[in-house]
Every structure is written in structure tokens, then in C-alpha cells.
Amino acid sequence: MINLNDAYEIADFIKNSKKKTPVKVYINCNNLNPKSCDEFKVFGSNDSYTLIGNYDEILKFLNENKHFITDTFVEFDGRNSAIPMYNYLHEHARIEPGAVIRDMVSIGKNAVIMMGAVINIGAVIGENSMIDMNAVIGARGIIGNNVHLGAGAVVAGVLEPPSATPAILEGVKVGKGAVVGAGAVVTHDVPPGSVVAGSPAKLIKMKDEKTSDKTKFIDILRNLD
């Protein structure tokens, strides 16, 4: 089992993994009755079939049977991918279309992941947290509970609640209740309850009631029922 706390082990896993190109291939054919096998699954009947699996194996089948095939159409969304997408069908979370979530992540209960968000291998999303549009969480990035990661934010380490469009370097921890200003580049740990901004980020003040009102969560958005 891969150690997701070791960046070198993750890199080695990606380097040595079998690269795959997942596809769906729709075919019309005459006098051909393809069957599911270890390399791909087959669905359909009456000379119209869908083949689902790795492109290289399916292409070999198509070439071997090209005289029986009258038409094809291929759907794909990657090429030689090292890490499959995460299967989140059974997560108790709201995940919008267009979110890109790699395998081996953890998604907490009632989390919300918006369209365009990118979550890489080993990332952890806490309960009741929202990952907003086009936010990026790098490998091993950890988002705590009740965090709102703002639109376009970039995270590459262990942290808690940043605001819109900061860049937070790997290994930096943002303390509980802290606010990271838009466009900030965070190179050092941020104390709990503080407000930082700038490039590099500097302490502006400790969070007051006005700042808390601006950054509080809209709980209704996390209702999945």
C-alpha cells in the first residue's frame, strides 16, 4: 500500500504505474458478437455494441475485426493516465459536474466540491468543507472541517481555511479560523484566527466580528437531503 505521506513514494508510484487510456467505443457491425474479457467490458446486442476499457486493448480488437465493423465512435477524457479517477458514487457529499478528483483521496461528510475544482492524489477534504470553483488541491493537501476554499485558490500542503485565489506553499499550515486574502502567497505558517495578505503574506490583524461575518459559511449550501 502506498504511503500517501511520502512525496517520493507518491512520485515513484506514478512513475511505475501502468499508464492507461480509458475509453468508451461504440460500434456497429455485421456478424460480430464481441464478449467481455479481462481487457474490456462489452454491452449491447444485435450488431450494436459498447466497449469500455483501455484503448490499446480495444484498438487491437477493432483492428482484428475491422472487416465486420461498419462504424465506430470513441469517447475519451485522457491519454496514458497514471492515476485513475476517484469513485465517489457512495460519498455523502455534493460533487458538481466538472470536478476532477484523482484516486486515493478522502472526502468528508457533507463536503461540497464545485465544478472545475481539481483534487489530486492523497488529498483530504474535511467534513462540511466547500472547495469552490477552479480551486486546486495538490497531492497530500489537507483541508480541515468547515473550511471554505475560495474560487481559484491553490493549495499544496497541510492547511485550514484560506480565502479566494491565494497560493499556499507545500507544508504550510493555516491555523483554525484564519483568513488568507485574495492573491496572497503564503510561505510561512499562519496563526489561528489571524488575517494575512500580500506577497509574501504578512499578518494584517487578528480576525474581528466584521471579518467573521464576511467569511462565515452558508450552511444551506451543504444540505444534501
What label would you give each PLM region?
Residues 1-91, 212-225:
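Terminal amphipathic alpha-helical/low-complexity segments used for targeting or macromolecular assembly
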Residues 61, 158, 206:
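Residues that scaffold the ATP/ADP-binding catalytic core of kinase and kinase-like folds
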Residues 88-197, 201-203:
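Structural signal for interior beta-strand "rungs" in well-ordered beta-sheet cores
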Residues 189-225:
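C-terminal appended segment following the main domain
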